[in-house]
Amino acid sequence: MLGTLLIVSGPSGSGKTTLCRRAEKDGLTAYSISCTTRQPRPGEQDGVDYHFLTPEVFAAQVAAGEFLEHATVHGNSYGTLKSDIIQLLEAGKNVVMDIDVQGAASIRACDDATIRRAYADVYIHVPSAELEARLRGRQTDAEEVIQLRLRNAAAEDARMGEYQFALVSADRESDYSRFTALLTTLGMRTTL
């Protein structure tokens, strides 16, 4: 049976990365190794931490339509190969991807039949007062960074209606319980 590709989006501070990492740690999902053009950091291994590519190889793969999603961040390119995701899905593995709203829209538009059949997405929404408290509680960002993140969150929240599911965040444990319930439910789809 085909696994589920669950795209998880939400503003900074929503807990989306924590949910994805915990599901992987608990063996509920498989890890997809991303590609990057940046240089390996000490201890990183090609094919384990990332697929380290030259900018030329990366650009050729973009031109060939081999990436499910890709972006350039701080001068380096990052992306997820369609073939890697399809291989995991066809092996019956669930894959979760922590992706911003623009990346989610790109994946949603993918025309690959396997990706389309396995696809689901969820938006993690945090009420604005709670989100501000979380961002301030981190005690890692300057005031202007917090304000920027809150403005970005409002813009991202405006796109919540593009998603199949919404998880209104409460606390880590109840969020994780509902997140895993969604993964379980998606695994019962008969359309796969």
Model-derived segments and spans:
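Short hydrophobic/aromatic beta-strand immediately N-terminal to the Walker A/P-loop
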Residues: 5-7
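P-loop (Walker A) phosphate-binding loop of NTP-binding proteins
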Residues: 9-11
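ATP-binding Walker
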Residues: 14
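Walker A/P-loop
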Residues: 17
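Post-Walker A helix-loop "phosphate-sensing" segment adjacent to the P-loop in P-loop NTPases
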Residues: 25-34
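ATP-dependent small-molecule kinase phosphotransfer cores
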Residues: 36-95, 101-102
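Conserved phosphate-donor/acceptor-positioning beta-strand/loop module used by diverse small-molecule
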Residues: 94-101, 114-138, 168
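NTP-dependent small-molecule kinase module
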Residues: 133, 139-141, 155-192
